[in-house]
Amino acid sequence: MDKPRVRFAPSPTGYLHIGGARTALFNWLWARRNGGTFVLRIEDTDRERSTQLAVDAILDGLRWLGLDWDEGPGVGGPHPPYFQTERLDLYKAHAERLIREGKAYACYCTREELDAQRKQAEAEKRQFRYPGTCRDEPYDPSRPHVVRFRVPDAGATSWNDLVKGVISTPHDTLQDEVILRGDGVPLYNFGAVVDDITMEINLVGRGDDHVNNTARQILMYEALGYPVPTFAHFPMILGADKARLSKRHGATSVTAYRDLGFLPQAVVNYLVRLGWSHGDQELFTLDELVRYFDLKDVGATAGVFNLEKMAWVNHEWLKRLSPEELAKLALPHFRAAGLPAEDDEKLRHVCAVARERAKTLGEYVQQFRYFYAPIALDPKAKAKFLTADTRPVLQAVRDAIAALPALETQAVEQVFHGEAERRGVGLGKVAQPARVALTGGTASPGMYDVVQILGKDETLRRLDEAIRVAGQPG
């Protein structure tokens, strides 16, 4: 069996989204497992919607996920160029060859004529199919025209899909579709076939929304006289309501998840499990995925995207990292929020306590910004815990911390336990007022962690401010 040559061919009309990223991942894994080649091709023929910004975002997203390409933009390869708009001569040459051989023909029908036929079909409540008006017209390249592919009148086209099994499409359900517009730009099916032929792609892995294109493309391969590649159509990714995945389900671009603080290995890990499994194992490194992944194990049932589950996977990966590793990853997120964090012992301590509590690096910032910014007292917490009755408690805690020669864990813990014992109350009666004073709210890591991270000077300053406002309205 030849080594696989697979491709990912996104359209740069938007960012790299979840479905596209999984398609790229499955192809990349198959190529890497089998010593094959992963080709990146940019299908930019929609000139009105394609942008360089989107191209850059797609490349950036793939790099962030760790999906390097062997041929394509930025790395070259033996079958350039890798942008469709730079390959128009190829499409024209293949279309003209099909015309010469009677397998395609020039269609001179005007848009107005076709629109009238569509309206008539609609009025008669039947599906419009091009009636082959120009099938036998002589070719006159001087007349404005498009090129249509001549679909065989009888029979069916079948293929054995690696994921979905045997699929057959009767030819009488197809029409003579346009393959080349008047401006020389190919339509999707023809452009993909010519590119896959000239780039020697032997396995086409893509979403199963392309199943209906496959018979048309196989007919084009056969008409051009080239081997038909193997096809694998991956199941769709749906939202929780079983509708097609969209932003309202929490799905967004891959780079947006990066900016929210997801790790690339977590996103890869979650995406691969949307349609593929290996026993009961949940977490995989990229190396493990390359070792285990097999297209035969991709299911035909649609996967359901669950942002909470992806956050859980991300949390599991975060917990595998050391505070030192987490600090380097979290630092850009703190700085992006305008917080004066540094890659130092303070941030490493913050990450150590955040690791069990927060599921994304973005949540590190949301939950623990009070270590780097002035606190905003929660009104309900202030009213309940910063009162005239708790002012003496706060003062006692403040004085005890001020007297400590160093903020050793045991010594800081003893400040709170000792004050609770002295007053004959539970620890919460001492710790909660101090927690509100130091963090602004009622949920935080242990008080010894909070005090150590803030440092003595900032701890005393915040306690002094809490003592000042305790019992005051507002």
Curated annotation (Swiss-Prot):
A motif ('HIGH' region) lies at residues 10-20. Keywords: Aminoacyl-tRNA synthetase, ATP-binding, Cytoplasm, Ligase, Metal-binding, Nucleotide-binding, Protein biosynthesis, Zinc. Its EC number is 6.1.1.17. It is an enzyme of class 6 (ligase). It is found in: Cytoplasm. Disulfide bonds: none annotated. A motif ('KMSKS' region) lies at residues 244-248. ATP binds at K247. NCBIfam families: gltX_bact (TIGR00464). This is Glutamate--tRNA ligase. It comes from Anaeromyxobacter dehalogenans (strain 2CP-C). The lineage of its organism: Bacteria, Pseudomonadati, Myxococcota, Myxococcia, Myxococcales. The gene is gltX.
